[in-house]
Amino acid sequence: MNVIRFSDLCAQGQVSGKRVFIRADLNVPQDDAGHITEDTRIRASIPCIQMALDAGAAVMVTSHLGRPTEGAFKPEDSLAPVAQRLAELMGRAVPLIANWVDGVSVQPGQLVLLENCRVNPGEKKNNEALARKMAALCDIFVHDAFGTAHRAEASTYGIAQFAKVACAGPLLAAEMDAISKALANPKRPLVAIVAGSKVSTKLTILKSLASKVDQLIVGGGIANTFMLAAGLKIGKSLAEPDLLEDARAVIAAMKARGAAVPIPTDVVTAKTFAADAVATVKAATDVADDDLILDIGPQTAAALATQLKAAGTIVWNGPVGVFEFPAFENGTQTIAHAIAESSAFSIAGGGDTLAAIAKYGIEKQIGYISTGGGAFLEVLEGKTLPAFEILTRRAAG
């Protein structure tokens, strides 16, 4: 990928005294009280910010948070908790600036956080007037938000069209390098885990990966749809019956290549979706009409762990069960530890996956942890992301 790298500009002394606008991904999960529950994305954004400060730049950083209504700012849309956490992690003041589109006062060596960019009218539709105003704020635009690389919005795409210089931050560049290592030229066998509740959003990926991977492990709501497709009963579990033909097509495509989609042989069920629900391990053929499947069973988990330990490359997206509930976390925990113990190059992405990695303390044993959810998925689909398209184009002059 031929893009300008921000690290190169810094090394060449081209950043000193310049106004640098960093589009980061600080979209972190919060509890009902607004406290940040998991700060991986904030931590991941710091190297780029520090690099800009060390190079003598006047630094502006923005991000989206949640799904606010454009033009209607509400207190819960504020990046204030993010500014506070960033200040704690960096050991310096991080002023938060509202209504910043028409101008920001920031000096070299200073860092400011610009309020939630998704509140700006025209952000999502990549409004040209908004993009030009943002581009006018800076000398150098740095895209360091892989999590938004699949969206052509004003703060991720439009500004890159009009800024004097548009480049990739260290996080974005590292994502690109890791993804090409995992997918463009993988060491085999290549095993992908695609799990989570949103089957419809991941079907394209399943179809794309079915032509690339040696094993395609499905979990969560997705596995339920595949179980249905294989003729098993799933009770009242989450599934998408209208997608059965698609699931069968994926199974057939894998089979035609001598590869497989392992269907669970045992599952963990409950009668209600609750942390205190009674967990029952059952054969996959014994699911009752009023059962909810909330995890893969121990036999299935052990079989998958064996496959993962023998893999050359592992792509992991999504927990295989409701790991937030202790009674239904065994499948995800077993798979997490198998990936950690495997000698394979592993790349993992998606918010729930990051939460599982943090819960089981295996950050150091994963080859590369992607901070992008949807963007990571679109790369898996084989798409060219808008961010890479525009940064490549700008690098080519």
Swiss-Prot record:
Tell me yes or no: is Nucleus among this UniProt entry's keywords.
Answer: no
Q: What is its EC number?
A: 2.7.2.3
Is Transferase among this UniProt entry's keywords?
yes
Q: Which positions bind substrate? A: D25, L26, N27, R41, H64, L65, G66, R67, R118, R151
For biological process, the GO terms are:
gluconeogenesis; glycolytic process
For this UniProt entry, the molecular function terms from Gene Ontology, in alphabetical order, are: ADP binding; ATP binding; phosphoglycerate kinase activity
User: Which reaction is this enzyme known to catalyze?
Assistant: (2R)-3-phosphoglycerate + ATP = (2R)-3-phospho-glyceroyl phosphate + ADP
Q: Which GO terms describe its cellular component?
A: cytosol
Arranged from A to Z, the UniProt key words for this protein are: ATP-binding, Cytoplasm, Glycolysis, Kinase, Nucleotide-binding, Transferase
So, what pathway does this thing act in? Answer: Carbohydrate degradation; glycolysis; pyruvate from D-glyceraldehyde 3-phosphate: step 2/5
- Positions that bind ATP: K202, E324, G350, G351, D352, T353
Task: Write out the annotated subcellular location.
Answer: Cytoplasm
Q: How does it assemble?
A: Monomer.
Q: What protein family is recorded?
A: Belongs to the phosphoglycerate kinase family.
Protein name (record): Phosphoglycerate kinase
The gene name reads pgk
